Amino acid sequence: MSTQPLVITLLGPTASGKTALALELAERLGLPVINVDSRQLYREMDVGTAKPTAEQQARVTHHLLDLRDPNQPITLQEFQAEATPCIERELSERGIALLVGGSGLYLKALTSGLKPPAVGPQPELRKQFSAMGQAVCHPLLAAADPIAAAKISPADVVRTQRALEVLYASGQPMSGQASVEPPPWRILELGLNPTNLRQRINQRTEQLYQDGLVEETQRLADRYGADLPLLQTIGYGEALQINDGSITRQAAIATTCQRTRQFAKRQRTWFRRQHTPQWLSEQDLLTEAMTLIEQHLG
């Protein structure tokens, strides 16, 4: 058995039940949860990101939530600079760490040692890209850096702008600047992929709207402007349309469900291609996960 410390990553598409299982695992193992959900890194974005509630955060310590305001974008490099010391601290103290999230690129960067381009935020460029609109920006990226564009959804405003930002600021495509330096950890990937995911997505979407997604979106728009890139993401974009009167609540819910299903499909594809998780069977998730963890701990 290797003496290297163990990093457990709990991954799966949105609405697959990661939060509930993470809380149980964290309590059983006496660990905090290290967040690897890109939208939960931002303050004030609580309902729309299904961020762990205050009660859940009181139950189990969570790291890497609420790092910045929504108008202060976090690059992958900056996220790694926050996350890596957090992981190393847990490994030093406990010999084990628990990462939880559905942001595949962020997980991959941490577990494989991907080193993204060292290009800082470029606010003026981002303003220009926002003014151009995603319908122009993604094709522009596809023409200039097709490798990067192929890995980014045409609807993903934040990552599209980041790839263009790197390209324009450095003069080199983002796809050609990344390198890999594997970390000195063992990785155990546990995957959730429930057969009833469509139903779970529908139920969670209804719950987000009941919990105040529309009101949260209005507060964010009032404070940061409706053109905030994060307000174009799933759920927030539809809530904006409710607030400006261009869509009904039921139509917004239906669109959010559809966009979430499409996103979950892309997540599943990413996890199959980029990760090698031990898929949990849905029967007794906690027992099965603990058995796998104990086997790796020896």
From Swiss-Prot:
SUPFAM superfamilies: P-loop containing nucleoside triphosphate hydrolases. ATP binds at residues 12-19. It holds the Pfam family IPPT. It comes from the Bacteria. The keyword Chloroplast does not apply. Its EC number is 2.5.1.75. GO terms for biological process: tRNA modification. Keywords: ATP-binding, Magnesium, Nucleotide-binding, Transferase, tRNA processing. It is an enzyme of class 2 (transferase). The record marks 103 as: Interaction with substrate tRNA. Its cofactor is Mg(2+). The keyword GTP-binding does not apply. Monomer. Belongs to the IPP transferase family. Catalyzes the transfer of a dimethylallyl group onto the adenine at position 37 in tRNAs that read codons beginning with uridine, leading to the formation of N6-(dimethylallyl)adenosine (i(6)A). This is tRNA dimethylallyltransferase. The lineage of its organism: Bacteria, Bacillati, Cyanobacteriota, Cyanophyceae, Synechococcales.
